[in-house]
Amino acid sequence: MDDLIARHYNFTGKFRKVHKDPGLKADSVVFIIVCCFIILENVLVLLTIWRTKKFHKPMYYFIGNLALSDLLAGVVYTANILLSGANTYKLTPTQWFFREGSMFVALAASVFSLLAIAIERHLTMLKMKLHNNGKTCRVFMLISTVWFIAAILGGLPVMGWNCIDSMNNCSTVLPLYHKAYILFCTTVFSVILMAIVILYARIYALVRTRSRKLVFRKVANGRGSNKSSEKSMALLKTVIIVLSCFIACWAPLFILLLLDVACQTLTCSILYKAEWFLALAVLNSAMNPLIYTLTSNEMRRAFIKMLNCGVCVQPSGKFSRPIMGAEFSRSKSDNSSHPNKDEPEYSPRETIVSSGNITSSS
């Protein structure tokens, strides 16, 4: 047993006698099963993107990076559970930092990937075109930056930002972490959350504004249509799903960590239930593949085809009409009367903003 870890756990009230915690509890087994599901679904998403040449585009690379980070979250959370309980006191401080730091890296990479997707979608809406050509290097540089920042963020405690020499500043949730570090991470994640909310709100506002302008133009030409408002409502539903899921999974953990910083040692009993809040954040890694990939008709079709035949998927050349509430087609609402060529300022390129990707076909 490592005396330093035991002292910190005892000081924060988390110390457990080894003989009282001999093995996995029922909730830990449930968490591991959920992690296995997370790993499986994200592996399938990665295989779908890898096997489908149509998905070898910047936006799908971001989706793939999100799946990779979520897959890693499932793996490291499983390892975290197996190394917890009585096994905690068998770890050296460095091993403990790697156990917890790997969780921070995986979850940070997942959150940063969500931000990267929101930024890419927003840029696409501003420029009204996709970055399909000549931008692969930029995309991979951005993905590399995501992982670099996540690794630095997760590695700060093992580099020295910890409370080994100042026990009074120790976190209750993570007894070797300094409260200042917990506050820093919570602030970073909260800023990212706000940025994602703002970006999706702007995406909706941009689409809504352009749809209204086109409706007014059509009404003036005697060609009124309610398709634009229907598509705007579809996008609004999608944005609400994306943001609600993200906030519901992450906000409780953010609040708990803020309580951890504010509370004195042994005063907040809710801090000893942190595993449930962390599990909820990890659950977001199970929801992301459903929200960001399977709501796309093309990805869902490729996904199912791969499961059925296990061979390289070759989707059809054209994207089908998106389902209501899952995808939003700007040009289909903006150009529903496209055969009439009296609106030259709008490109014939079709841009689909799904709940997790933006694709185009010409």
Swiss-Prot record:
GO biological process: adenylate cyclase-activating G protein-coupled receptor signaling pathway; angiogenesis; cell migration involved in gastrulation; chemotaxis; G protein-coupled receptor signaling pathway; heart development; mesodermal cell migration; negative regulation of angiogenesis
Comp. bias (Basic and acidic residues): 329-348
Annotated region (Disordered), positions in chain: 328-362
Claim: Lipoprotein is one of the keywords in the record: yes
Keywords: Cell membrane, Chemotaxis, Disulfide bond, G-protein coupled receptor, Glycoprotein, Lipoprotein, Membrane, Palmitate, Phosphoprotein, Receptor, Transducer, Transmembrane, Transmembrane helix
Binding site for sphing-4-enine 1-phosphate: 99-100, 246-250
Single annotated GO MF: sphingosine-1-phosphate receptor activity
TM regions (residue ranges): 26-47, 62-83, 96-117, 140-161, 176-203, 239-259, 271-291
Membrane topology: Multi-pass membrane protein
SS bonds (residue pairs): 163-170, 263-268
Subcellular location: Cell membrane
Extracellular side: 1-25, 84-95, 162-175, 260-270
Gene Ontology CC terms, in alphabetical order: cytoplasm; membrane; plasma membrane
Cytoplasmic face residues: 48-61, 118-139, 204-238, 292-362
Glycosylation sites (chain numbering): 10, 169
Biased composition (Polar residues): 352-362
Lipidation (S-palmitoyl cysteine): 309
Source species, domain of life: Eukaryota
Similarity comment text for this entry: Belongs to the G-protein coupled receptor 1 family.
Physiological role: G-protein coupled receptor for the bioactive lysosphingolipid sphingosine 1-phosphate (S1P) that seems to be coupled to the G(i) subclass of heteromeric G proteins. Signaling leads to the activation of RAC1, SRC, PTK2/FAK1 and MAP kinases. Plays an important role in cell migration, probably via its role in the reorganization of the actin cytoskeleton and the formation of lamellipodia in response to stimuli that increase the activity of the sphingosine kinase SPHK1. Required for normal chemotaxis toward sphingosine 1-phosphate.
Name of the molecule in the record: Sphingosine 1-phosphate receptor 1
Naturally occurring in which organism (per UniProt): Danio rerio (Zebrafish)
